[in-house]
C-alpha cells in the first residue's frame, strides 16, 4: 500500500501548553481510517497538521508526491445576506476551471440541488455539497471532520453509506473524525484513539479491547459495541 502521509514524533504546543505529543503514524492508500477521542484531545489540531495548515513544533511530516487531498470541514460559515447557489459555490474552487458540476453532484446524489441556495439546504444536504466540492480535484485522501454533525439520524445513515461508496468507487483513503462508535465498528479499517497522544490504534476489534480506550469512553459504550453483530457475510480486509 502507498503511504500517503507519514507523521513522525509530532509535537504541537500553544503558549507553552502541550496539545499533541509524540504522534507517529502513516495514512495508507485505499482505507477508511477513523480518528476518535474525547473533547480537547487534539483531533482538530492533528487534522490541521495533516492538511499542512499548521506546522508542528517538533517532528517530521512526509507527504507522497502523488497525494491529492480533499477536505470537508466540521462547519462552514457564510453570510446569509449574500445568497449563493450550489452551482456558484462549486465554481468558487480555484482548483479547476472547467468543472462538470452536474456530474460531481450526481456522484453524491445531490443533482437536484444544483440551483438551490445554500442557506435553504438541510444539514444533510449541505454535507453532500461540501463532500462534492472536496471531490473536485479527484483526491486520493479525503479528510472529513465530523461529517454528520447537524445531520438527523436517517441522514447520518445515508451519508455514511455514501462515504463508503465513494471510497469503493474512487479507491481513495478517507480519514474521518467521528464520535459514532457504531460506524467505527461497522465500516472502518483502522482506528486511531487520540488523547493528546495516541492511546491506541489498530483494527476496531483491537482498539475496543484496549484499557485506555475503555477508560476514556466507558464500559457502557463497550457493552453496546459488544452486542454489535454484522448484518452481512463478507470478511473485512485490513
Curated annotation (Swiss-Prot):
GO terms for molecular function: ABC-type zinc transporter activity; ATP binding; ATP hydrolysis activity. Transmembrane segments: none annotated. One of its GO terms (biological process) is response to zinc ion. It is an enzyme of class 7 (translocase). It catalyses: Zn(2+)(out) + ATP(in) + H2O(in) = Zn(2+)(in) + ADP(in) + phosphate(in) + H(+)(in). Gene3D superfamilies: P-loop containing nucleotide triphosphate hydrolases. It holds the Pfam family ABC_tran. One of its GO terms (cellular component) is plasma membrane. It is a peripheral membrane protein. Its EC number is 7.2.2.20. Part of the ABC transporter complex ZnuABC involved in zinc import. Responsible for energy coupling to the transport system. Belongs to the ABC transporter superfamily. Zinc importer (TC 3.A.1.15.5) family. This is Zinc import ATP-binding protein ZnuC. It comes from Buchnera aphidicola subsp. Schizaphis graminum (strain Sg).
